[in-house]
């Protein structure tokens, strides 16, 4: 007796239903969504588990949705609900980019509230780490755990020099036909250069529905916010009682690694991870190790 012909449409529907239960599996294919925050549309991508405390990725200077390493996003999404987003005025999100970290933190909280989350974990990289610290200080009940990568405290060593360093490396990248992140995020050793090229290649894996690049005006306003953060008086980090994982490379040229040691010393419940022969983007260079450590931290 002949079997029934293969139902391709039915199989596709079943696969879509299964994907809905487990969540989108790959950042490469995660759809870009939008949510109204007051009168501004914020764009975001969501993947991983459909339930549980979400991990909100808070981005770096010039960073949009496409600037997160897919190995890090997919690795954490294997066990958690992950959400990346463009803050106000960045990428495809509307509005004007704030020129202060405090305003960026308020916008991030408003975005989280718009998605109706009562509690989240934060992964803040670089500028996103500044923002994450303020959120934990100002709305402590919203935050369960925090990962601070390639970042530093208010008034931290060398943060006021980020603007100069960024422009110099962008100019060098233009002359040498490189992505600026190859210079800003990685060491100039043979290994660092190799890892930088691999990272930039991974950022190009997504070919459809890519985000908009940051505008020059938004870039300048972000730099203004970073410079002001570097000029601030040190804040009392003892009030951040949540568990914190601090991670960085041992040779961060943007936010000097000394700031990571300072954070780990001043935060009451901090764990420090420093990666060898790595720079500002140490969590991307050592993505396999970082994902293991992040999953252990978030799951403990």
Positions of predicted regions on the chain:
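Catalytic histidine-centered segment of alpha/beta-hydrolase-like enzymes
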Residues: 272, 278-291
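Flexible "cap/lid" loop of the alpha/beta hydrolase fold
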Residues: 137, 144-176
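Gly/Ala-rich beta-loop-alpha elbow adjacent to hydrolase catalytic centers
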Residues: 124-128, 132
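Short beta-strand/loop motif that positions the catalytic acidic residue
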Residues: 240, 246-248
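Conserved alpha/beta-hydrolase catalytic His-Asp/Glu region
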Residues: 179-231, 235-236
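Acidic catalytic loop of the alpha/beta-hydrolase fold
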Residues: 251-255
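Active-site loop/oxyanion-hole signature of alpha/beta-hydrolase fold enzymes
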Residues: 83-123, 292
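Conserved HGGG/HGGXW glycine-rich cap/lid loop of the alpha/beta-hydrolase fold
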Residues: 40-94
